[in-house]
């Protein structure tokens, strides 16, 4: 596709929605919870002051401080936010060609955005003092030039501040904030605002809503009168009632629709998101258009994904993030030696992040080396293979085990699994160290034979991580056989794992011939299940307590210490 060709913007948006459909959770409840808290807690006199400051053509340090202070308060109140997370993609996370493509597109995007922010037709709008701006106007007038004031109906907004980096990530709308401001400042009920924005969101599933659409919907929903009809401009804040902010809010509170706005990035799905995005890009012929101007759908998605590897790219608070996308996401094409193959697969989840240090990697490598590839090695997981929450490796011959956890990205599915299977509570694993589970799988000795009880999910998990070389032996015990020593194992070795504190509700038969019924109300722990299966194979309880190869301090992020 020639880059001068008109971009089929909405078609690209629809294609990206479909290509990333696996990561569109329903977030309406979370958005409205944050909106209610903001509406009840924020000082709307401060909001009015910030809105007034942002309407000025020339803004200074005091205006920026007001904006940053209010953003900090909103960020404190919100549960939906993006956090600082610097990500380095390496070979194994993505293929070499994908890494090069990502690096190239981020560089092009950087150039485009910097040119756009420097002003139309080369007019610099950045960190000039008021004296310099006045002097420049006089020089241009003397030389016979008309001073440019922006393209079309757009308004040039000049910030006269000492540190331009403080402007980063202070702008952009958030649905929770938009809903709260429309409710309080519009004198409306939140329910009427939600209904109106839902109508906009439904329209957005088939087209980009425009001002004519807004006028027609306003006849049905009077609260939409507060939405401004002004042209969008650079550095528009989340406190402005723009049409784009209203549409984004509407998209976020739809149930279904595969809206990009509801994407959540986690350390474990980041690489697969990038991989899927690049696949859609190639299929549709998308590209980075380096000419200054608004971002096309691919540019917008790439920028938002790469700003932080942990959070809500479109709808969360991001005002506490430092740097830009090209600062926070980088590519390293240096191939590091590995014990086992870690080839990129379709779902590409072998993400390496800054919070798994070289020292931590060395500890994990040393632990995996202690597993004997010639002896029986049990492997069990809890959670689905695409979103596992627990993994255990147990070797009876040397009494060694590796046991690690992972925070899930599908919280609804996790709660269901907790209730009917593993009994893990989110509060017990929310601080699990990202990347450990994938790194352990990647280091397993090549062509090793692994013993399992049920192999389908484990086979899929290994394939996702590029470990098709690993062989599985499924002992295929019945449910009753597998859990013969259930209670005895929990009584003897339950102290080895303290992360199954939920109540497990047995699945009951609906009919007489129902083939499935759990025979125990004990939770399923990957580690204790491995010990249990070995006991069944031995025909007696395992006697000796196994030894952990990974320290607990490596498995979880350190808790923040608070001093009064």
Curated annotation (Swiss-Prot):
SUPFAM superfamilies from the UniProt entry: Ribonuclease H-like
Stretch list, region Binding site for the cap structure m7GTP: 54-236
Q: Which UniProt keywords apply?
A: Capsid protein, Helical capsid protein, Host cytoplasm, Host-virus interaction, Hydrolase, Inhibition of host IKBKE by virus, Inhibition of host innate immune response by virus, Inhibition of host RLR pathway by virus, Interferon antiviral system evasion, Manganese, Metal-binding, Ribonucleoprotein, RNA-binding, Viral immunoevasion, Viral nucleoprotein, Virion, Zinc
Please classify the protein's predominant subcellular localization into one broad category.
virion
User: Can you tell me which residues bind Mn(2+)?
Assistant: 380, 382, 529
Residues that coordinate or bind Zn(2+): 390, 497, 500, 525
**Annotated site location: Important for exonuclease activity:** 457
Q: Does the keyword Zinc apply?
A: yes
Gene3D superfamilies, sorted:
Arenaviral nucleoprotein, C-terminal domain, Arenavirus nucleocapsid protein, head domain
Catalytic activity, EC: 3.1.13.-
Locations listed in the record: Virion; Host cytoplasm
The alphabetized list of GO BP terms reads: negative stranded viral RNA replication; RNA-templated viral transcription; symbiont-mediated suppression of host cytoplasmic pattern recognition receptor signaling pathway via inhibition of IKBKE activity
| Cellular component terms per the entry's GO annotation | helical viral capsid; host cell cytoplasm; ribonucleoprotein complex; viral nucleocapsid
**Which InterPro entries does the record match to this protein?**
Nucleocapsid_arenaviridae (IPR000229), Nucleocapsid_C_arenaviridae (IPR035084), Nucleocapsid_C_sf (IPR038115), Nucleocapsid_N_arenaviridae (IPR035083), RNaseH-like_sf (IPR012337)
Molecular function, one GO term:
metal ion binding
Q: What is known of its domains?
A: The N-terminal region is important for the cap-binding activity while the C-terminal region contains the 3'-5' exoribonuclease activity. A CCHE zinc binding site is present in the C-terminal region and may thus contribute to the substrate binding and/or the specificity of the exonuclease activity.
Subunit structure, per the record?
Homomultimerizes to form the nucleocapsid. Binds to viral genomic RNA. Interacts with glycoprotein G2. Interacts with protein Z; this interaction probably directs the encapsidated genome to budding sites. Interacts with protein L; this interaction does not interfere with Z-L interaction. Interacts with host IKBKE (via Protein kinase domain); the interaction inhibits IKBKE kinase activity.
Q: What does this protein do?
A: Encapsidates the genome, protecting it from nucleases. The encapsidated genomic RNA is termed the nucleocapsid (NC). Serves as template for viral transcription and replication. The increased presence of protein N in host cell does not seem to trigger the switch from transcription to replication as observed in other negative strain RNA viruses.
Similarity remark: Belongs to the arenaviridae nucleocapsid protein family.
This chain belongs to which protein, by name?
Answer: Nucleoprotein
